[in-house]
Amino acid sequence: MQLPMLLLVSLPLLLNMFKPAEAQFPRQCATIESLRSGMCCPDYFPVFGPGSDQCGVSTGRGRCVQVTVDSRPHGPQYIHDGRDDREQWPIRFFNQTCRCNGNFSGYNCGSCRPGWTGPTCSQQINIVRRNLLDLSTEERRRFVNALHQAKVTIHPDIVIATRRREEIFGPDGNTPQFENISIYNYFVWSHYYSVRKTFLGAGQQSFERVDFSHEGPAFVTWHRYHLLQLERDMQNMLQDSTFGLPYWNFATGQNTCDICSDDLMGARSNFDVSLISQNSIFSTWRVLCESIEDYDSLGTICNSTEGGPIRRNPAGNVARPMVQRLPEPEDVPQCLEVGIFDTPPFYSNSTDSFRNTVEGYSDPSGKYDPAVRSLHNLAHLFLNGTGGQTHLSPNDPIFVLLHTFTDAVFDEWLRRYSADISTYPLENAPIGHNREYNMVPFWPPVTNNEMFVTAPENLGYSYDIEWPGPLRVTEMITIAIVTALVLVAIIFAAAACIVRAKKNRDELHQPLLTDQYQHYSDDYDGIATPSQSVV
């Protein structure tokens, strides 16, 4: 068979073999040679032997280049520069990567950018992410089954590091410390790796004021790519390029979980209120990255070992009444009125910041209040279990649905404000959160800036959701007038009741309330700062 015919026959097969790896690290690069050379530029179609088609260079897909890292200063929260493998990601592991041309993408440029498909990545595609509760019975079943399949299917391309860079070659110096991991567990592991503490050495307390995916501008961009990666992995697993992750609209204001049924994310167990019903497949799931004390004291990294079951007890935290109810429906449109993406210090105490508001450290109007947990944070805490612990939260599959809705809010904000990136800081954000920082631990490197775009036009997906538009001036005036009239009516009615009650009391010579009755104002008077939320 002549070479051109061989290429024609073999290419479709190879296209299926080389699926995208968008994280740490492609299996082909987890070798002594690659680690020592610092090069991770796998072949796409090596007709003439290994190394003959790095990044698909022979067909113009891409080329091997030096990794570009962000060297701008980060914020003051992190004080241990030089001690963490995630600094200037991914330079501690690799300094050369594939840079793909046009719509090509992936660790060897063998796949397509989000929103494109086909052998030459020339066919546009748009995935629709829908409300989980709007899915048919069959669609719900398929989604639940797909999640479970991802939980038990080894990722075809990715392996995870189980040691820090200084120990990556193993005890004998010749055994790379990487492990296989399932598709869904990789999703869990990525999140853990981004939030883990910085190990400072045996006998020293690990540094905890570091988080590459929360409490800063990258919160929305990091989680956007995190979801995009899982969605792509599941599309490949299912061989269905139209598969889209659904969302959970958690802004119901209720004290019940409307997706916690056995046909969806699992009802409450009849035998233990903190466990999932045995009628749900999710009751069989086991949690990854539980041994946080060992990681922090020994300097080890979470591996593929699973532990105990998922814990979940929605609205069950009686010690914190504020987290016993989900965000109110009006919280979302109120959040969308915050027109500045982020504000100094670009941290969890920023005020008038859309990012800090949707993340849930500010109240829905954008005002920072240390006593408040709203929107995304409140939804996590409401779950009251695995889903409420940052390093473990993706183990509960509700995480996926919670974050697709959060991403939908982010995408609507981008649409309303024309993706105004001017207030996304180039520098002085918490480490990992600068605009041009490569998000940890994704591979090939992808910056926060690349995810700060409207999804339908740039990332190939959209949300089936209707948002309430901003109120017009006439509507606001009308609401204000009606509210004022109602208040006046209430005041007159209350005054009439007081007069009538006083008259009756005088006539009967008997007080309405005894001295032992607790007045509503008693607790309020004891609050030092009444303007703060009372929990």
Curated annotation (Swiss-Prot):
The cofactors named for this UniProt entry are: Cu(2+); Zn(2+)
Q: What is the lineage of its organism?
A: Eukaryota, Metazoa, Chordata, Craniata, Vertebrata
Cellular component annotations (GO), alphabetically ordered: melanosome; melanosome membrane
State which Enzyme Commission number(s) the record gives. 1.14.18.-
Q: Which organism is it from?
A: Gallus gallus
Residue spans, topological domain Cytoplasmic: 500-535
Say yes or no: keyword Zinc present.
yes
Q: What is this protein called?
A: 5,6-dihydroxyindole-2-carboxylic acid oxidase
Instruction: Indicate the principal place this protein occupies in or around the cell.
Output: membrane
How does the cofactor bind to this protein, according to its record?
Answer: Contains bound zinc ions after heterologous expression in insect cells.
The positions annotated for binding Zn(2+) B are: 376, 380, 403
Q: Do you know which SUPFAM superfamilies this protein is assigned to?
A: Di-copper centre-containing domain
State the pathway, as annotated in the record.
Pigment biosynthesis; melanin biosynthesis
Subunit structure, as described in the record: Tyrosinase, TYRP1 and TYRP2 may form a multienzyme complex.
An individual GO BP term: melanin biosynthetic process
- Cell compartment(s), UniProt: Melanosome membrane
Cystine bridges: 29-40, 41-64, 55-98, 100-109, 112-121, 257-260, 289-302
Family, according to the entry, reads as follows: Belongs to the tyrosinase family.
Q: Where does Zn(2+) A bind?
A: 191, 214, 223
Lumenal, melanosome side, ranges: 24-478
